[in-house]
From Swiss-Prot:
Phosphorylated during mitosis. Phosphorylation inhibits interaction with Golgi membranes and is required for the fragmentation of the Golgi stacks during mitosis. Disulfide bonds: none annotated. The gene is Nsfl1c. Residues 54-73, 80-116, 138-157 are annotated as: Disordered. Keywords: Chromosome, Cytoplasm, Cytoskeleton, Golgi apparatus, Lipid-binding, Nucleus, Phosphoprotein. PANTHER family: NSFL1 COFACTOR P47, UBX DOMAIN CONTAINING PROTEIN. InterPro entries: NSFL1C_SEP_dom_sf (IPR036241), SEP_domain (IPR012989), UBA-like_sf (IPR009060), Ubiquitin-like_domsf (IPR029071), UBX_dom (IPR001012). The keyword NADP does not apply. This is NSFL1 cofactor p47. Changing residue 57 to A: No effect on phosphorylation. Pfam families: SEP, UBA_4, UBX. Changing residue 272 to A: No effect on phosphorylation. Part of a ternary complex containing STX5A, NSFL1C and VCP. NSFL1C forms a homotrimer that binds to one end of a VCP homohexamer. The complex binds to membranes enriched in phosphatidylethanolamine-containing lipids and promotes Golgi membrane fusion. Interaction with VCIP135 leads to dissociation of the complex via ATP hydrolysis by VCP. Binds ubiquitin and mono-ubiquitinated proteins via its N-terminal UBA-like domain when bound to VCP. The modification Phosphoserine is found at residues 74, 102, 114, 140, 176, 192, 272.
Length: 370
């Protein structure tokens, strides 16, 4: 036993270069375990010159300068590797004043991850929380992402031929929410949802969204879209592609319009044929004709498809034609309309002109609703 302790003492001194009394102190504290004593010596701030420990028998220890075997790892190597890993996560370290062990240490800001590393983290986090990789399938237009289960009623068949079938009502959905299917596309410089705009990875407002994806959770903004329903989220890897906004889907016109060839919408005429004839006769008698002056016949094509022909003096004005139309069709009194010529097609804006001044003698006038 004494000889083994002397060998351990000599090897400790040879490895560390410490004095014999100090070496004996560390060995006695470690129960004469050489490896524990050496570890305690360096943890206590021993000599900075760390010498590689060979795994050979302790009878022949050399302090030569020959290169150590690749299979041997020193305490300094372990500490150095750990420091490198921490620097990658925490940022570069700087020392102000003194040496490495006595100076002030300053840790720089964390190193920003590249888009590739960020996308890898998102996919890795999603898989760790149950996401499954699937092949991309091209859907035909109009195909839904998930078939809807039948929720109606039906008849339960009887157990015997003479037993009547019983009607079974379908169960109503327990919630009023709607299922939402969203495609998350991860691009080179950002991400997009469905056919939306590009959102940058570096934008602080998107940090919470990306962190939720990495933890395998549905982001809050997608849960709000579902209104309590289920959210189906697909992730697509486009990290090697630049973002290109897809063309908007074609939407058919759903408004109202007019049939081609129709000058204006038709006006409903609720008057009976007898009442209409009476109104036209009354309107015609309201136009006072001076037989001593020149006269002309004006043909008027109404917006309701009707046609009127009335005699006027050359001195009558365009406003008189308007009054004649209103008297012949009382329903037109509450309708806004203009009078136009047929060829050339122009609006008769100045209704104070006489028929002769407006060159409307024996003309055809068209009524157009506005």
């Amino acid at each position: 036993m004494a000889e083994e302790r002397q060998d351990a003492l000599r090897e400790f001194v040879a490895v560390t270069g410490a004095e014999e009394d100090r070496a004996r102190f560390f060995l006695e504290s470690a129960g004469w375990d050489l490896q524990i004593a050496l570890a305690s010596f360096y943890e206590d701030g021993g000599d900075e010159d760390i010498v590689t420990i060979s795994q050979a028998t302790p009878s022949s220890v050399s302090r030569g300068t020959a290169p150590s075997d690749n299979r041997v790892t020193s305490f300094r190597d372990l500490i150095h590797d750990q420091d490198e890993e921490e620097e990658e996560e925490e940022g570069q370290r700087f020392y102000a004043g003194g040496s490495e062990r006595s100076g002030q240490q300053i840790v720089g800001p964390p190193r920003k991850k590249s888009p590739n590393e960020l996308v890898d983290d998102l996919f890795k986090g999603a898989k760790e929380h149950g996401a499954v990789a699937v092949e991309r399938v091209t859907k035909s237009p109009g195909e839904t992402s998930k078939p809807r289960p039948f929720a109606g009623g039906g008849y339960r068949l009887g157990a015997a031929p003479e037993e009547e079938s019983a009607y079974v009502a379908g169960e109503r959905r327990r919630h009023s929410g709607q299922d939402v299917h969203v495609v998350l596309k991860l691009w080179k410089t950002g991400f997009s949802l469905d056919n939306g705009d590009l959102r940058s990875y570096q934008d602080p407002s998107n940090a919470q969204f990306l962190e939720s994806i990495r933890r395998g959770e549905v982001p809050a903004e997608l849960r709000r879209l579902a209104h309590g329903g289920q959210v189906n989220l697909d992730m697509e890897d486009h990290r090697d592609e630049d973002f290109v906004k897809p063309k908007g889907a074609f939407k058919a016109f759903t408004g109202e319009g007019q049939k081609l060839g129709s000058t204006a919408p038709q006006v409903l005429n609720t008057s009976s044929p007898a009442q209409q004839a009476e109104n036209e006769a009354k309107a015609s008698s309201s136009i006072l004709i001076n037989e001593a002056e020149p006269t002309t016949n004006i043909q008027i094509r109404l917006a309701d498809g009707g046609r009127l022909v009335q005699k006027f003096n050359h001195s009558h004005r365009i406003s008189d034609i308007r009054l004649f139309i209103v008297d012949a069709r009382p329903a037109m009194a509450a309708t806004s309309f203009v009078l136009m010529t047929t060829f050339p097609n122009k609006e008769l804006a100045d209704e104070n002109q006489t028929l002769k001044e407006a060159n409307l003698l024996n003309a055809v006038i068209v009524q157009r609703l506005t």
